[in-house]
Structure formats: structure tokens, C-alpha cells
Amino acid sequence: MEFNVWLAFAISSLLIALIPGPGVASIIGFAMHSGKRVALASVMGMAVGNALAVTLSLAGAATILATSALAFNILKWAGAFYLIAIGLVAILKNEQALSFDGAASGALPRSAFLTNMLVGVLHPKTILFFVAISAQFIRPDQPYLPQAVILVITFTAVAAASDTAYALTASRAARLFRSEQSIRWIRRAGGGVLVTAGCAIATIQK
């Protein structure tokens, strides 16, 4: 793959990654509710989920999703319900220690990682959209597999960098409010963002 083709794809990936969607909303929710460490774990989970999703898309899953309304809706609703459930738990679970630093402060890093890994994998639009843009950068006269690997790695890395920026910004903003009442409301807001992200996934249409 020529450098100018790769660079064009990297820039396209960055523009896509910067647009806030359900994935970014869930990362911000974790940052506001549980702090930087948990937010960064959710970023790692999203990166793994994105990598799996785009790999599946290049392996043919996009064709199934594009032609099967049932498969599309199963992925969509599974991701939506999961995020909404996590958000409601975050809103209702306010009796834990009010701190952004320990595991008791909210979600555990492992649960944030697994949650966003599922969000990445269960987001059907990621699969369909990646196929739409990657097709513009794969040359049929060159071996397919090396090009596909480069695109998957590039997209995942660029999206992870963008998500990290969102996580650090949101967690830093949340730390500006240190009173117990402020932290309670920040956590509720974080849970609300997760619920909103789930609702956003539920409204996706083919």
C-alpha cells in the first residue's frame, strides 16, 4: 500500500473517530462516573471491539448484516440493552465511597473493558461503515490480506487515540468538582450518558 493511500485512509479514520457516537458517549460516561483509570480501560475495550468488528467486516459479516434485518437488529438491541443496563446501575448505585481513585468509586476497569469491547463488537454500523470506506483504499491489483491488515490496524489505532483524548478530557473535567454532592451528580450524569449511548444505538436504522 502506497504511503499517500495509507495517509488518506488514516485521515478519513480520524475524521470518523472524532465524531461523537455511542462509543464515545460510553467512554465519557465511564470517565465521569468512575475516573481516568476506568475510562482508559474502557478505551482499551473499545479498541479491541473495534478491531474485532472491522476484522469481521472484512471477513464477510458486513454482507450478512446488509442483507439480514434480523442479524442487524440482534446486534443493535444487544448493544443497546447492555449499555442502558450499565447506565441504570451507575445511576442507582450511589451508596459506594465517593472517590474517583479506587475500585469502589464505581465501575471496575475490567467491567469497563468488557462493556466497551461488547459495544464495539455489537455496533453494526461500525462493520457496515468500515466496509464502505475501506473499499475505497484497497487496490484489487495488490494482495488483499496485507492491505486489510494495514487498514484494520490503522483504523483501530487512530480510533483509540481519539477515544483516549475524550477519556482524559472528560476525567479531568470531572475532577474539577470534588465535593460529595458534585461527585454524586457527576456519577449520575455519567450513568445518564451511558443510557443515552444505549438509546442512540437503539435508534440506528439500516
Feature names for model-found ranges:
Residues 113-121:
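A short amphipathic helical element positioned immediately N-terminal to and/or at the very start
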Residues 21, 123, 191:
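Short, conserved phosphate/pyrophosphate- and ester-handling motifs at nucleotide-, phospho-/glycolipid
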Residues 3-73, 132-151, 155-156, 167:
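Juxtamembrane transmembrane-helix termini in multi-pass membrane transport proteins
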Residues 14, 18, 51-52, 88, ...:
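Hydrophobic/aromatic residues within the transmembrane alpha-helices of Major Facilitator Superfamily
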Residues 92-111:
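Flexible cytoplasmic inter-helical loops of multi-pass small-molecule transporters
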Residues 55-58, 122-127, 131, 194-206:
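Hydrophobic alpha-helical transmembrane segments in multi-pass integral membrane proteins
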Residues 4, 107-112, 124:
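Juxtamembrane cytosolic amphipathic helices that cap and anchor the N-termini
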Residues 67-98, 156, 162-170, 174-206:
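Selective transmembrane alpha-helices of multi-pass membrane proteins
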